[in-house]
Amino acid sequence: NNSIFDIDFSLLINDSEIPINIEGSIPINKSDKLDLRLIGNGKFIELIDIFADEYFTFKKGEVNLRMLIKGSLNKPILNGFIVIKDSEIDFYNNIIKDINSLIIFDFDSLEIKNLEAKVEDSGDVFIRGALPFYSKNDSGESEIKMITSKFSLKTDNTDFLIDSEID
């Protein structure tokens, strides 16, 4: 079966004038090739906010997404980026602010370029490194470095204080 599903989809969230765009083709056969383009232009984070219910709320800032999705449905290959600038979120009633990062999807791995954030009335976190999407990747890179200083996350039942350097 060589059928494909052609898609050209734009989604407007709430009163937004900027859509989330998805266009390309999705094969019916899972081993055939994908060809999708996803452009978030700051609005895809609002979609995540809607689906995450009360556990995650995007408060402010800029989050932009551009993504090419190739490969197959069984093993997609992602090429693109997420840029986060001066953002703030509420995660389980913890305000995490001053979030800045560049996240690169480089075919078979994810690279985090200097993600920095602060917890309101608490410490900060810094994350950098790369992880493969699959257990084996061509680049060979698979290391994440996380440095936290008095980074506190609280929920109704827990209070985590993380002060560490993890390689």
Regions found by a protein language model. Give the residues of each.
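Interface amphipathic segments
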Residues: 1-66, 74-166
